[in-house]
């Protein structure tokens, strides 16, 4: 795996075009800039057209056709934050509220994309997935 920062769709296309020349790579992990943020389908289409397995930091890319994502489960984290804020509003002193690190990660896998790339997904990986997009 090789991490790649992408600021826009042009960077994404260029990274995917250049990657084969850099030697064997099993997959690319993308950290996408804000200019790409809402272009989920366009990013997933470019990644799929490259035939390179890709992993994203946001589930929306997987729902749009990307292969996989692994990230903090923000819904769960927001709930935990609300519990801590509630304690503050009820008068508990901030120093008495234990600090909580985020612990719940979410792994999402797109089987349709895996099939399109000709990837065999091991059963153990399917069992580890928190969500599978068919």
Question: At which residue positions do the language-model features occur?
Answer:
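Short hydrophobic alpha-helices and adjacent helix-cap/hinge residues
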Residues: 1-134
């Amino acid at each position: 795996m090789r991490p790649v920062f992408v600021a826009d769709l042009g960077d994404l296309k260029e990274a995917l075009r250049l990657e084969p020349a850099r030697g064997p790579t099993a997959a690319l992990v993308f950290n996408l800039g804000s200019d790409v943020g809402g272009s989920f389908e366009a990013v997933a289409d470019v990644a799929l057209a490259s035939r390179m397995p890709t992993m994203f930091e946001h589930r929306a890319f997987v729902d749009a056709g990307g292969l996989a994502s692994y990230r903090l489960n923000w819904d769960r984290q927001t709930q935990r934050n609300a519990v801590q804020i509630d304690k503050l509003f009820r008068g508990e002193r901030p120093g008495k509220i234990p600090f909580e690190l985020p612990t719940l990660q979410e792994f999402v896998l797109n089987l349709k994309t895996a099939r399109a790339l000709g990837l065999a997904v091991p059963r153990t990986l399917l069992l580890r997935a928190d969500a599978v997009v068919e």
